[in-house]
Amino acid sequence: MVGPMGEEMRESMEIAMTLAQHTMAERMKQRVYYDIIVTLGVDEEVMYDGPSAGLAIYISAMGAMLGWESSPEVAVTGEVKRDGSVIRVGGIKNKMRLAALGLISTVLVPVGNAKTLGKSEYEDFGGDLDILGVSHVDEVALGEYHGR
C-alpha cells in the first residue's frame, strides 16, 4: 500500500485485501496468491484516514483478480469489517452531494446509510443518483453489482 494514509485507513485496506484473498480462495477451492499494489492517487501533502474506503478497496482487489472493468460513473463508500459486513460511514450526505456534482450515476453505500437517504434528500443534491445498499462483501463478490 503506497500513499499518505493514516492507521485507520491502512487497517481498512488490510481487512479488504484479506477478505478479497479469502473470497478468491473459496472460488478457486485452493489458496491463491496475487501481487496487488494499492496506490492512492492523492495530494501527497494531505494525510488521508478513515475506514470509508474499505468496500472500494475490496471491489478494486476483486476486480484486479477477476479482470472486472471499473466504471468512472460508479462511486463506492463503506467500512468493511473482518466478517465481511459493510457498515455505515459518516459524511454520507456530503459524499452523495459530491457524487451528484460529478459524472457519477451509481453509488454503492452501506445498507444502513442507504436506508437513511430518502429519495428527496439526494434529489436535492442536483443529481439523479442510483443509490444501492450493500450489507456484505459477498453481494459484490457474487456479481450482484457487477457491470454497473
Q: What do these predicted regions represent?
A:
Residues 1-148:
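Peripheral, non-AAA+ core regions of ATP-driven protein-machinery
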